[in-house]
From Swiss-Prot:
Transmembrane regions listed in the UniProt entry: 8-28, 41-61
Keywords recorded for this protein, A-Z: Cell membrane, Membrane, Transmembrane, Transmembrane helix
Gene Ontology cellular-component annotations: plasma membrane
Source species: Bacillus subtilis (strain 168)
Location(s), subcellular: Cell membrane
Organism phylogeny: Bacteria, Bacillati, Bacillota, Bacilli, Bacillales
Keyword Transmembrane belongs to the record: yes
The keyword Cell membrane is assigned to this record: yes
Protein name: Uncharacterized protein YphE
Membrane topology note: Multi-pass membrane protein
């Protein structure tokens, strides 16, 4: 697998983490009644969003692949 395909899969995984973060925030805000569980789920969601943002930043600013 070449570098361009690896960057594509990292970007796709980052989008998956963003989707997981959105679903977790929805779950924590509208479906959970337990306060501790709300905090735990929303913390998980914000960590997913932070990690996905870092991955996207690295993929985008690493530049195009020379082939």
């Amino acid at each position: 697998m070449n570098l361009a395909l690896m960057k594509m899969w990292f970007a796709l995984g980052s989008m998956g983490l963003m989707f997981l973060a959105v679903a977790s925030i929805y779950l924590s805000r509208f479906k959970c009644q337990n306060r501790f569980l709300k905090i735990a789920i929303s913390s998980f969601a914000y960590m997913c969003m932070l990690i996905s943002g870092i991955i996207v930043f690295v993929v985008v600013f690493s530049g195009p692949v020379n082939e």
